[in-house]
Structure formats: C-alpha cells, structure tokens
Amino acid sequence: MKRTLYLLALSLSLLAELSAQTPSLHGVVTDPSGALVPAATVQLRGPGGEQHKTTDGSGQYSFPSLRPGKYTVRIAGKGFAIFEKTELDVTAPTVLDVQLQIQTEAQVLNVEADANTTVSSDPDSNGGALVLGQKELATLSDDPDELSQQLQAMAGPGAGPNGAQIYIDGFNGSSLPSKSSIREIRINSNPFSPVYDRPGFGRIEILTKPGMDSLHGQAFVQYNNEDFNSRSPLLEQSTRPPYKQEFFGLNVTGPVKKNKASFSFDAQRRNTTENAFIYATDLSASLVPQTVNQAVLTPLTFTMLSPRLDYALNANNTLTVRYQNTRSSSDNQGVGSFNLSTLGYNATTSENTIQATETSIINTHLVNETRFQFMRSTTGMTGGTNDADISVQGAFTSGGAQVGNSGTRTNEWEGTNTSTFTHGTHTFKWGGRVRGTSLSSTSVANFGGTFTFTGGDGPELDANNDPIAGTSIELDALEVYRRTLLLQQEGLSDAQIRALGGGAYMFSIAAGMPTTSASMTDVGLFVNDDWRVRPNLTLSLGARYEAQTSVGDYGDITPRLGIAWGIDGKGSKAAKTVLRAGAGAFYDRITQATFLQALRYNGVTQQSYVIFNPSFFPNVPTATSLAAGLQPQQLQIMDNSLRSPRNYQANVGVDRQINSFARISVNYIASRGVHLLRSRNINDPVDGVYPFGDSEIRLLNETTGLSRTNQLMVSPNINYKKLFLFGFYSLSYGKDDNEGQPADPYNLRAEWGPSTFADVRHRFVLGTSIPLPLKASISPFIVLQSGTPYNITTGLDPNDDGIFTARPELVTGVTAANCSGANLVYEAKFGCFNVNPPAGAATIERNYGRGPGSATLMLRLSRTWAFGEKRESDPNAGGFGGPPPGGGGGGRGGPGGPGGGGPPPGGAPPGMGFNSGRRYTVTLGVNAMNALNHPNYAAPNGDLTSPFFGISQSLAGGFGPVGGASTYNRKIDFQLRFGF
C-alpha cells in the first residue's frame, strides 16, 4: 500500500514538473508611468504559425502550451507605438512585461484597423461589441446630451426598459464627460462577465484620457440660432420661434512631474434658448373649443468643470483622482404637450463627484484595483403658483405648478475592489462592490389639489345648449368640462349639471409633511475563471451574488457562462471564424424612488385624498376638513415578499473575419424577465364590494411582472485605409406585462402585450467617415427604426380608482355608419370600438397600436488646417495613464479598459481624423441634426375620447433637443476648434 502511494505521489510530482516546464509566455503591458494597458493587441509569431491575443482588464496576456523555439512578439495599443521583440527564446514558462510608448497617429490607425476587423476567442473580443475609437467618435455629437442619446440608440433593446447602463472609468451614475476627454467607448462588450450586475447587451463603457507629459489642449466654440434651423411640422405658426445655443469647451493636459504625474482639465458651458411645444385643446372665454399650438421659451444653462490627476506612486502602483462639478438651470419646466404655460416652474441641478482609483501590480501574475466614488447631487424647483389644477383628460391641463420650494439632496457612494490572477491557461478574477444611497426629498406636489374631468355620456344639446329629449351621446372630457362651466353660469345645481353630462369626475389633494428621507445599500460579489482550454477555445465560468437592503431576497446567486471557439483555428493558426455562446442571470435593483414614494404616501407622512364625483368644483376644500370627514386616500404600499427583478439571458453568435479589413458578427439573443416590478390597486371593488372593507386606493408595488425578448443582431465592421464603417441591424420581438397600471388589477394575464422598448421590430445604426478633397471629411451617422407600440385606452375609469388604463372592445362586423351611440367610437384605422364594454367582453391587447417609423441622419463636415513648427514624435512622451478605468473592455471577465496613453502628440483635435504633426491646428466643422429634415413623429395619442386620438403631438426625438418637445425638426451647428 505504501509503495502504491509512493508511486502515485511520484507520478503526480513528475506530471506537475512536466506541466510546469511546458513552454508558455505571459506578461503585463503598461504605459510609461506604469499604468496598465488593457485591450492591447499581442501578436506572437514562431514555431507553428501566428497567434493573436488581447490584454485583459488588468493589462495581462497569456500564451499557454507553446512549442519550444524562438518567437517574435509585437504589441500595440491605441495611442501607443508598436513594441517588437525578436528572437525571444521560449523553452519554458517565460515572462515578458512590456512598457509601451506614445508614437505617431499612422501607427495608431493601423492598430485600430487590425483590432476592429480581426476575430478572437478572447471573452472581451466579441464581434457584436461596438468599439468606438477617435475616428468613430468623430461621427458623433459633441453635446453630451445628444451623445448620450446616440449611445443609447447604439446599445439597442437589450438594455431593457431603463436604458443602457453607462460606466465612466468603471464608475456608474456620474454625468457624461465631454467628448474631447473620451479616449474610447465600448458598447455590449463581454456580455456575460460576472463583473457587472446588468446584462452586457446594453452596457456602455466610457474610458477617458489620462494626462500627458507635455502640454496639449484644445478649445472650441459652437453656435446655432433659429436662422439655421427648420420648424417642427407640428408647429402652426409661420415664423421660427426664438432659439440660440452657445456652446464652449476647453480641454488641457500636461505634466505635473515628468514621468511621475500629469493632469488634465475639462470645462464646458452651454447657454441654450430652447422651446417647449404645447399641443392641446382648451376653451375660449366664450366656452368655444380652441386649439393651443404654441412654443414656450425654456432657457437653460449648463456648466461643467472636471480636473484629473494621474500619479505614479511607484513602479507598481498608480493613482488616479478625478473631480467633476456640474451645474444647470432651466426655466418653464413642466410645460408642453397637454400642459399649458401656467404649469411652468424653474429648476436647478448641481452635482459634485470625486473618484479615486488605485492599481497595484503585485507581481506578474496578480493585479489588484480599488475604486471609490462619492457623489452629491442637489435639485431644486421654484416658481409658479399653488392654484388648483384642472386636468381635462385628452385635452389640456392648467392651473398652478404646485412646486413651492421643492427639491432633493442625494448622497451616493461606491467602493469596488477587483483582483486578477493569471496561472497557466487560467485567468481568475474576483472582487466586490458596495454602494450606498441616501436622499432627502421635499415635495408639495398636489398640495393645491387637482380636479379631473373625463369623458362620459349625456343628452345631445341643440344650438341653444338645451337638451334634446330622448337622446344620449358619447361625450369627450372637453365637452364634459364645457358643459360644467356653461351650466354653472346658468345657475344649475351639481346634480342637475351631472344629469346633463357635466361635473368633475375626481378631486385629489395631498397634505402633510413635505420632507421625506430614505436610504439604501446594495452589495455585489463575483468570481470568474477564463480558461484557455486550447489556443482556439476559451471557457468562461463565473458567478455573482447580489443583495440590497429593504428587499428580503438575500439568496441572489447567479451563474455566468461563456464559450468562444475558433472553429477554423488549428494549433498556432489564428481563427477567422469564432463561435460564441453564453448564458447568465442578471439581477436588477428596486430603485430608491420606489421606496421613497411608499414612505411619502403611506397615509402618515403625507395624505393623498381622492374624492369621486365632487360637488364643490371649483372650490378647494381644506385637508383638515377632508381628514375630519374620513375621506378615502390613495396609499402606496410595498409588498412584504419583494424579490429582486431578474433577467435570464442567453446568446449564440458567430464572428467572421471576411478579409484583412472587414468583419461581420451575427448574434441571436434571448431574454426572459421574471419578478419585474409592477403596481396595482389591490382594493378594487369586486361586484361592488371592497376587499379591505373601505374605499381606500391601495397601490401595491410587487415583483410579479414578466417579459420575453428575442433579438437577432448583425454587426459589420470595415476599416479600409481612411474609410471605416460600424453599426448594426437588429430584428427584435418582445412582450411584457408590467408597463404601467393594469386595466384589470385582478387579471394580469390580460396585460401580456408588445413591449414599448423591445418590440421595435427593426433598428439600423450606421456610422462612417468619408475623406473628401482638400483635406476635408464628411461623417454620416444614421439611425432607422420601425414604429413603437402604443396603448389604446378608453380614457375612462370603470374601476373608480383614478387609474385611466381601461381598454376598449373592438366590435367586429360594424361599419362606420352603424358605429354610433353612447359607447361606440369609430376609428378608420382600427374599426368600431366600444369604450364601455360589458363585463366579460374581450378587450384589445395592451399596446395594440403601432406608431410610425423614424429615419434620422446626423451629418458632420469638417476641414482642418495645421500650422506652426513641425513636432517630432517623442518616444518618451508617454501619458500617465493611471489605473485602467474599470468598466472598459471587460476583458477576460474584468472591468478594466484602456487606461494609458491619450492622444498622440501633435495637437490634432481628437475625432477629426487628421494629424499633421504641426504644433497648432484649427478645425472648422458644420453639424446637422436630422440633416434631411425628415419629420419623425412620436407615437400617436391613444385616448379614444381625446380629440387628438391617432395624432402625434410631438416629434419622436432623435438626439438631444431636436425632436421630442422641441419646436425644431432640423438643427445646424457651426463649430470652430483650436488644438495645440
């Protein structure tokens, strides 16, 4: 027995020794300051052919199981010179750590072209990801608001109803930086990495530039006014409403101590005279319906200041500290669509953010990164009156803004620690994140009260406004309101007015303590192993744990799995076709705003009274009298059995390198959401009986919602000489049942219908840049998409709970001529609707309508002039990249992104695609939003009792203020940029 054990131990020892002596190559890539450089391309050429790798989030690379012999290693990263080492003898496990240097733009472009058009079995090199370098960024807007919307469009529907999650240098929640300070953007990269809580198909990672060791910078001014814009086709006035934007920006970077520390500084200022668009119907002084088609000035200002320090503590430790302050003010908020100008108020916002990241290269196998962020934001609302509001469903809302002196102060902090360890064919990554949020909110919303008028029925009136005996017709809300005012002038009582079809349907008012506070903490832990099973096969195995306070669901452990197989890769031969598959579960957080509402409207902190068929219009009762009369309230309640919303997602796809300059990726993505948050009234009367024995409206927030999405995405990428192209096409089908309040709170299955965000069937995004004569370039950015589903409702409240989501019955076989009566409404596009269907009748599905498609072209034309003395490239002009901004690249399960370098020397304005090596550059640019002036309409009004049913009341929007509530359809900006 002892001999057997001895032989077994000896065998294992020999096997371990043989394994340990198997030739391999690994190392860490850094910039001149010692900061890590993820996403660098590593090319290995030697016995058996050529292999390619990409450094992971911690700047590490690994080539396991090599043949013994001499190799040539070439390493290149965006913004760096190409490193090359020949005759490297690899006969055992070998370590090669490399420090890259800054070099010329020409080399950078070659590296970008190679990285964007080759395929790899690395987890972070999925072909379905969009990687936007300086060339691609040049096609996008300089305005941070417009840029954010463009990035959201590129993220696609995989992001979910809350939109894509944006990480800036690994931090989530801070404001978007200026485009001039952005080094790279990665969208939908490494989608199943357990480093992240949210699905990767819908993740945007923004990596900012570090400082440099010589002074560089740029400044720009952008201008626009109404003379260069085109009116919204919905605006009826013949003249353009006033508009002006003045946009200034500054970016400076330079040394603090050579090869030790550097700084960068960003500043922005925007002064914009924008307009809100009111499209409603109210009554004239003589009680005649009139259309309100009006532009209302909404001036706004925005200021941003952001310094950054990159410091090399020693050869193995780097520190980056960044501070950002933003301030904005805007007037006449709350105005637009049905909301008349009397509802306007002024708003201010300020945000202070400090971020610190420390990276330690413990040894060639182990890297640790620690990040911390603290953010304080303050919002304030002032102005307007506290007059009671009048809400006429589907027509208009007027009255006072009722904001008083409201506002919210929020403190948010986040701490993250991540370690990466490479061993043989394995790259292990583990770490965790803790976040905390506390807020104090002051609100006097609806302290002045609101009268609501809805549609109904009543006798037909003759020309003298006298009732015609024996008649009954359907009345819209505006007519009910008109009759109320008319009959009050004639001295009729409330009962008489209601008999003739008038009278307010509902009165609501809030009272109590204006200020409410709430806090929340959540934690996430993860572990991952990227196992290089073979040179052309990588298996990623990981898990993540999530938990948050106020939700008693503490067992949220989710597996993450990914596989990448280079089908035609053999031995050291690089694959040109990579098959990818992955699966995982992703937990979402229930927002603090949801808990805040429940704390505010719990019947104690604030009281929200609701009175149906009030007889006192237009007089407003006091809250004291309502409390004394034990009037019913609307309560917000959190379910005791809340669970964390989760999304199960799976993906299979193929990345194919077509030739040296073209690549295409095809992916199928399936998602299933469970335990999604929804709200419903659990005290709706059943056969006239209230389940809780009183008439209080109890809105229960529960996690019982479901969703399902299937998506096919095709992503091409072309990089040929000076021409490049990126984008995607997606075909998407999606359904859910948790959008808004249900029509029947006891029949949630009836809510299963098309999703407003996931059932946009066709999406097409394309960005490119085309060189023109005279050193000019033109950069189109195109977004096409089919129509968005929208809900069709009756505009009525058959459940008497103040919720207007009831859907009609579509009566088949009834012609327009026969579709008449008290409850019937005919719409040519759909047919005959019964807005008050009998019990048990089949109503239409939620989101039964389909809005119009949209087509938007953004066009940028630019020309750069260079002057001053010729500047030679300095191989030592490295940037102090600091630690790799987490949230970039994701590589091999990691959050790190390209951290070092910055733009090449020469002062070329980033994104302009031109670098002469001269000291100074001047660039003149013209940017056109919706260049073709194509009208893109929003989804139509879906209220059957509204005079606007089937009519779009606003533009669909596009990027920034063009579209949506804006009064302009096309906007043309002029920009002058100076670089040095």
Language-model-derived ranges and their functions:
Residues N271, I278-Q290, I362, L366-A395, ...:
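A surface-exposed, glycine/aromatic-enriched loop/edge motif typical of exported proteins
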